[in-house]
Amino acid sequence: STTTTTTTTSTTTTTTTTSTTTTMAPPPGAADCIAAMPLATRVGQVLMPVVDQGGLLEVADLAGRGLIAGAVVVEPVDGGLGDAIASVQAVSATGSLVMAVDEEGGTVQRLDSLLGQMPSARQMAGHPIGDVRIAARQRAEAMAGLGFTMNLAPVVDVGAGPGIGSRSFSEDPVVVAAFGSAVAYGVLDAGLTPVAKHFPGHGRASADSHEELPVTPPFEDLEAVDLVPWRYMPPGTAVMVGHLSVPGLTDGVSTSLSHEAVTGLLRREMGFDGLVISDDLAMGAVAGGMDIPQAAVLSLRAGVDLLIVGPSDGVAGVAWELVMALEDGRLSPGRVNEAVERVLAQRGVDPCGFEWE
């Protein structure tokens, strides 16, 4: 009978492991191992700078010291990009890194010089939905060939307001949900992580968040229209929170810094338990009102897991501020550890696989 018990246990374990891989849940004991990480390394696992190909050298230095979770790559890029990304991964002190890029199509595609032109979301919505999924998969396969692990797409904003335009599939939430999920599935088919953006909906906001903090329609309007597509994103999709002021929800505070928006609405009400990423905290909507390190503290407190923090030369300052916030009580260790746990699980990194000095 002992043997039977053992078999049952090991079967259960196997099953658990399988489902773990699919949902990317952390391995048992992960929380303890994360709590044992050196503080600077731990806070680094929630930070992603934005760099061009030339800036990947600086990123390699940060990665070698265990101070970042990955990087967002922007233009200019050239034929040496794949090698540059591989060299960053090779020196990382904390395992596989997130290598992300905005490859939406239309006006926002960083790799068109290498991979060719891709239609905008608005143009895609005129094509058969199955073809869109295939095209998204093919593009993501080409991205994987360069070393990318994440596509900061699809845009599931409803409407073509300032800063969005043809980046949105449609003014109709059902069309956005259908095509947005087709793109997300295509990206997943290629083994990359899709990132739906910009929660809770930038499509009908008053301004471009690169310049200033836009105001959306009132929350009850958002619920009926803009929140619809988010409910249809496939499991494994991450969510990027935009910089938006929502009357009746955040009232003048950016959603990316709002506990009500991220933890209250996205996590609790909508039940999202995947990875939450901030839009770039260096954008005018946020940076206009405070510095990036302060914004990073608020964004983590709000419930965001992975922070895009602008240029790589600012990473040390952000990390320092997060350490200070942990020490003075503005940030709870539990919240930081939870974010790190999600990011490492997303990267397929076992936090117990390291020996810290």
Which stretches of residues belong to each language-model region?
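Second-shell residues forming the walls of enzyme active-site clefts
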Residues: P38, G80-A86, A90-V91, V174-L331
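A charged helix-plus-loop insertion that forms the helical arch/lid used to bind
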Residues: L115-P128
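Glycine-rich, aromatic-flanked loop segments that form ligand/cofactor-binding clefts
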Residues: Q89-G116, V132-D157, V176, G180, ...
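N-terminal hydrophobic targeting/anchoring segments and the immediately downstream early-domain regions
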Residues: M24-A100, G106-S113
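Extracellular mucin-like PTS domains
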Residues: S1-A25
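Short acidic, glycine-rich surface-loop motifs adjacent to enzyme active sites
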Residues: D61-G80, L152, V156-P162, P234-G252
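Preference for extracellular/luminal or secreted protein segments
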Residues: A25-G64, E269, A287-E357
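Hydrophobic faces of well-ordered beta-strands that scaffold small-molecule active sites
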Residues: G44-V51, A69-V73, L97-E104, M150-P154, ...
